[in-house]
């Protein structure tokens, strides 16, 4: 049990570097180490990549259509315990409390609403940066701007397929994060380049790359139906939450489903939430997971 550092390392590694198929705009396809930035940029310009343009989905409605392009062909979705293939739905969860149908019928007033959200980036001032050293004894030292040193260590070790004891992550003082600097992005790449070059490797992400490739808060759609009595107490609530996960599964539907009615004492509730893949970077926390 890896707790908050739990991650599917196969998908995590494919998030960092495209493998056969680019699944979101800006996804890295190659990495270069050089003695300085100018040499690296010159080498990068010499790399030619041929792309076959594929159909994409960029919102939860299009992603759930019957003939929608499938982002991850090997994804097996979990629909309330039922395994689903050939889908962009990673997970469907439900919370049930009380007798929702009867309480809704007994309510004096019914209110319904639909709320659509766009992805929003955290907008931290300091860019992502990391320095990695892969020593000859296979001990890996990484200095990085992160909000979660231990989750980062777990993810880096899993992606590099080394023991956690081989990885030391030193978190640096960060210039803003707001939840967006918990995932790892290029730390494992810096480590591999260090191993190949035999030198320390420093990487700093440009602002365009930050907006294109690092995790924003999820976009999505929420439907709400409330049964309210004449005394203005909420008697019944039904919600459907569709959240973008990005191009890899594992979004924020769990916290969202738990917290949507947290400020209220509602005796009868049904909350359904779906984790939906779209051709965007993997989402991350923004202020608080699921907020």
Regions found by a protein language model. Give the residues of each.
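Alpha-helical support elements that line or immediately flank enzyme active sites
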Residues: 1, 30-51, 130-197, 243, ...
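Glycine-rich loop/linker segments at domain edges
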Residues: 6-12, 82-130, 221-291
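Acidic, glycine-rich active-site loops and adjacent beta-strand->loop/helix elements
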Residues: 146-149, 173-177, 205-215, 240-245, ...
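Flexible, low-hydrophobicity surface segments
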Residues: 1-84, 110-113
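Glycine-rich and small/hydrophobic secondary-structure elements
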Residues: 8-40, 180-230, 283-291
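Beta-strand segments within the central parallel beta-sheet cores of soluble alpha/beta enzyme folds
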Residues: 165-172, 198-208, 235-240, 266
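Structural signal for hydrophobic packing residues in well-ordered secondary-structure cores
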Residues: 38, 44-55, 68, 97, ...
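Short, structured patches in soluble enzyme cores that scaffold and shape functional sites
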Residues: 115, 134-136, 144-146, 171-173, ...
